[in-house]
Amino acid sequence: MSAASASTAPQAVSSRFSQFYALTKPRVVQLIVFCAFIGMVLAVPGLPSGEQWLHMAIACFGIWLVAGAAAAFNCLVEQHIDARMNRTAWRPTAKGELSNAQTLAFSALLCLAGSLVLFVWVNALTMWLTFATFVGYAVIYTVVLKPRTPQNIVIGGASGAMPPVLGWASMTGDVGPEPLILFLIIFLWTPPHFWALALYRVEDYRKSGLPMLPVTHGNEFTRLQVLLYTFILFAGCLMPFVYGMSSWIYLAAAVVLCTGFCAYAFRLWRNYSDALARKTFRFSLIHLSLLFAALLVDHYVL
C-alpha cells in the first residue's frame, strides 16, 4: 500500500462515519434523550442510587439508538424533498453520498439494537413504547401525514412528545398521570415551535411540495395559530404545579418562560419579519430546555 493510500484510508472511514452519524440528526436526538432523562429522574423519589444511574444510562442509550433509527428512516424517505430545501440539502441522503440500501440497513440496525437494549436491560414496556414511537414518527408522520396535511405537525407531534413517557416507564415499568402531563406540554409546544420555523423557511417548503401551514393557509393565519398555541401551552405548562408534581421554583420558571414565548408570538403576530420568526423558533428551544431543567432543579431542591 502506498503512503498516499494509507493516509487517505482513515479519512475515508472518518468521512463515512460522519455521514452515518449525520443521518441520526444528533441535535434533535439530544433533545429527545434529554426529555426522556427528565422523565427518568422525576420517576425516582430523591437522589437515584448508583444502580439507578446505570439503569438510566442504559435506557438513554437504547432510546438514543431507536430515535437515531427513526431520524435515519426519515432521511431515507425524504431524500428528494431534502435535496430541494436549502436547510436540508446537506444531508448525506440528499447529496447521494449514501445509498438507499445503506441508509435502510443502518436504520434497521439501530432500531434492532436499541430495541434489544431496552428489552433485555430496561423493560418490555419501554421497548414497545419506544418502538411505537419509531413507527409513529418514521411511518405515520413521515410517510402518511407530512406529505398530505398541514396539520401534520399537530397530529404527528404525539410521537415527538413521547420521550418523558419513555423515561418514566423505563424506571417504573408503568405510565401514570405525571409523564402524561409532560407529554401534553411537548405536544402543545410542537406546533408553535415548528410553525415559527416554517414561517421563515416558507419558500423552502413551497419548493419541497410539503403542505406546511404557511404554504397552504398563508403567513397571517399561521402567525395567529402560533399565538393561540402559545397561550394554550402556557396553561399546559402550569399543570405540573397544579397536579402537585412541582413547587414554586418550577412555577416561577414556567411563568417567566411562557410569558417570554407568548411575547415573541404576539410580536410575531403584530409585526412579522423573518428575523423575528427565527428568534421565536430559537427561543422555543430555550423555552423547552429550561422548562424541563427547572423541573429537574425543583425535584431535587424541594
From Swiss-Prot:
One Pfam family linked to the record: UbiA
Primary location class: membrane
Taxonomic superkingdom: Bacteria
Keyword annotations: Cell inner membrane, Cell membrane, Heme biosynthesis, Membrane, Transferase, Transmembrane, Transmembrane helix
Gene3D superfamilies named in the record: UbiA prenyltransferase
Top-tier EC class: transferase
EC number(s) given by UniProt: 2.5.1.141
Assigned GO CC terms: plasma membrane
GO biological process: heme O biosynthetic process
InterPro entries (alphabetical): Protohaem_IX_farnesylTrfase, UbiA_prenyltransferase, UbiA_prenylTrfase_CS, UbiA_sf
Transmembrane annotation, as ranges: 28-48, 53-73, 116-136, 153-173, 180-200, 226-246, 248-268, 281-301
Catalytic activity field: heme b + (2E,6E)-farnesyl diphosphate + H2O = Fe(II)-heme o + diphosphate
Described purpose of this protein according to its UniProt entry: Converts heme B (protoheme IX) to heme O by substitution of the vinyl group on carbon 2 of heme B porphyrin ring with a hydroxyethyl farnesyl side group.
Protein name: Protoheme IX farnesyltransferase
Organism name: Paracidovorax citrulli (strain AAC00-1) (Acidovorax citrulli)
Classification lineage: Bacteria, Pseudomonadati, Pseudomonadota, Betaproteobacteria, Burkholderiales
